[in-house]
Amino acid sequence: MKTAILTMNYSSISNVSEDIAEVLRENGEIVTITKNPFYIPKAEKLIVFIPFHPPSLNPYLYAFYQFNGKKLFYTTCDGIPNIEIVNKYLLQDVKFIPNSKFSAMNLQEVGLQTDLPVFHGINFKIVENAEKLVPQLKQKLDKDFPNTIKFGIVSGLTKRKNMDLMLQVFNELNTKYPDIAKKIHFFVISHKQFTQNEVPANVHFVAEFGFNSREYIFGFYGAMDYIIVPSGTEGFGMPVLESMAMGTPVIHQLMPPFDEFTSWQWNLLIKSSKVEEYYDKEHGQKWKIHKFEIEDMINAIILASELQDREERSTKLKELAKRYDIRNLYTRFLE
């Protein structure tokens, strides 16, 4: 069977599309990936995978509508979408496959049809390659920052990511707990604009977001002692699951959709202190952004730096992540 996958150029979206294609090819399908909604290669099946981003949705919906053959529309939705700016005719007969129960709820909130969710998965071939990088990365980190605990963050800078709160965490940890801060270092992969912020000496900008291979990002997760995911709303939250697959415990808020796949026992979860509603015009969504108290995040970081069971946590998280193998989850697209 010839299959076309229509997607977007965001790195996280492209990665999932490549994984879907890999599973389909292993099962005998001939797959072409396109990022142009105005040109769909000849195919018997079409899979659209894009974020539910109302301002840019119409061309993709039209391509889906026009396609004659089997078709599936897979999506992620971080908040309640504004469908007033979307062509209602093109929406009416689409049954969306969400990537989480949370994405499904956001779509259902505005009356859209949803199928059973297909969680994002882990490509364990990439994990295997990334694990080969980890010893070298750890060796360099231990040489440059001996006898310290390393915390990693991979995050964009949109409002919902809560990186503004992390800047406060960095500063308060260093001012209120200087002795503890001496043994802690933070390593950040983010957008270049992050470097415009004044941060303490133990906060290091490692690389620009979206410009590294997947193996490098997974290797980065594996080289850290802990990963922090400060985000306040996500359609899914791949950094949490990817870190788990590399055996690195994650500090994150207890909130949907993380609570659909995280480990309450082996990750470190902090409570949300409030939920802020914010309409983002650029994304055409109303976000419910979970916020945490600065002190709660600091306490979680300090607790993590003192834990004695980090290796047990690592083993358990790797075991849990195996449930989310792309070769099991993405067989849904073979239908």
Curated annotation (Swiss-Prot):
Keyword Glycosyltransferase: yes
Signal peptide: none
Entry-linked SUPFAM superfamilies: UDP-Glycosyltransferase/glycogen phosphorylase (SSF53756)
Glycosyltransferase keyword on record: yes
Pfam families membership: Glycos_transf_1
Keywords, alphabetical: Glycosyltransferase, Transferase
Positions in coiled-coil regions: none
GO terms of molecular function: glycosyltransferase activity
Enzyme Commission number(s) of this protein: 2.4.-.-
Name of the top EC class for this enzyme: transferase
Gene3D superfamilies, A to Z: Glycogen Phosphorylase B
Origin superkingdom: Viruses
Annotated PANTHER family: GLYCOSYLTRANSFERASE WBBK-RELATED
Family indicated by similarity: Belongs to the glycosyltransferase group 1 family. Glycosyltransferase 4 subfamily.
Name of the molecule in the record: Uncharacterized glycosyltransferase 335
The species this protein was found in: Sulfolobus islandicus rod-shaped virus 1
